[in-house]
Amino acid sequence: MKLRWLLILVVFLAGCSSKHDYTNPPWNPEVPVKRAMQWMPISEKAGAAWGVDPQLITAIIAIESGGNPAVVSKSGAVGLMQLKPSTSGRDVYRRMGWRGEPSVSELKNPERNISMGAAYLSILENGPLAGIKDPQVMRYAVVVSYANGAGALLRTFSSNRQDAIEEINDLDADEFFEHVVKKHPAPQAPRYIWKLQKALDAM
């Protein structure tokens, strides 16, 4: 009987540890970053237009599509920065004062995709995440929100946006990352930060 409960405990602890093992499966950024770097002139142009670091744009391209502009995910995300027409694409259109949403063919165009991806990063930083003071924390918050939504992130701190921002401002980058590991409902959220740092280090 004791052996049975010991085995159950081992399985339970293994499950708990694997839940937060954001490094598995392994990810080598070398090739994706190299392919993403070919779009750097466009990323620099889009970054300047929207006030977004082109290295951040390049890292997201490496993570999202590996530099392939024709990629369409099972969930319908399209192109280099894997934008969904009906969500992030629609948000960018609204920001530009346009109606509707971008087409799949538009999002497969590298220049249009990167421009709209940079615009969406700017929307996140200057909208739901506005007020975060630490630049590195802001970067982490932006990429987690890019991947899983700003609302999902902020709700791990508070149901009130301003209270959530104040709690975030009490954390440094490492503390913010640990919070995401422990509190964010999406297991890919801490993994995205981990991949972001690996991609930036590979540039």
Curated annotation (Swiss-Prot):
<keyword id="KW-0961">Cell wall biogenesis/degradation</keyword>
<dbReference type="InterPro" id="IPR000189">
    <property type="entry name" value="Transglyc_AS"/>
</dbReference>
<feature type="signal peptide">
    <location>
        <begin position="1"/>
        <end position="15"/>
    </location>
</feature>
<dbReference type="GO" id="GO:0009279">
    <property type="term" value="C:cell outer membrane"/>
</dbReference>
<comment type="similarity">
    <text>Belongs to the transglycosylase Slt family.</text>
</comment>
<keyword id="KW-0998">Cell outer membrane</keyword>
<dbReference type="GO" id="GO:0008932">
    <property type="term" value="F:lytic endotransglycosylase activity"/>
</dbReference>
<dbReference type="InterPro" id="IPR008258">
    <property type="entry name" value="Transglycosylase_SLT_dom_1"/>
</dbReference>
<feature type="lipid moiety-binding region" description="S-diacylglycerol cysteine">
    <location>
        <position position="16"/>
    </location>
</feature>
<comment type="function">
    <text>Murein-degrading enzyme. May play a role in recycling of muropeptides during cell elongation and/or cell division. Preferentially cleaves at a distance of more than two disaccharide units from the ends of the glycan chain.</text>
</comment>
<dbReference type="GO" id="GO:0000270">
    <property type="term" value="P:peptidoglycan metabolic process"/>
</dbReference>
<keyword id="KW-0456">Lyase</keyword>
<dbReference type="InterPro" id="IPR023346">
    <property type="entry name" value="Lysozyme-like_dom_sf"/>
</dbReference>
<keyword id="KW-0472">Membrane</keyword>
<protein>
    <recommendedName>
        <fullName>Endo-type membrane-bound lytic murein transglycosylase A</fullName>
        <ecNumber>4.2.2.n2</ecNumber>
    </recommendedName>
</protein>
<dbReference type="GO" id="GO:0016998">
    <property type="term" value="P:cell wall macromolecule catabolic process"/>
</dbReference>
<dbReference type="InterPro" id="IPR023946">
    <property type="entry name" value="EmtA"/>
</dbReference>
<keyword id="KW-0564">Palmitate</keyword>
<feature type="lipid moiety-binding region" description="N-palmitoyl cysteine">
    <location>
        <position position="16"/>
    </location>
</feature>
<dbReference type="Pfam" id="PF01464">
    <property type="entry name" value="SLT"/>
</dbReference>
<keyword id="KW-0732">Signal</keyword>
<keyword id="KW-0449">Lipoprotein</keyword>
<dbReference type="GO" id="GO:0071555">
    <property type="term" value="P:cell wall organization"/>
</dbReference>
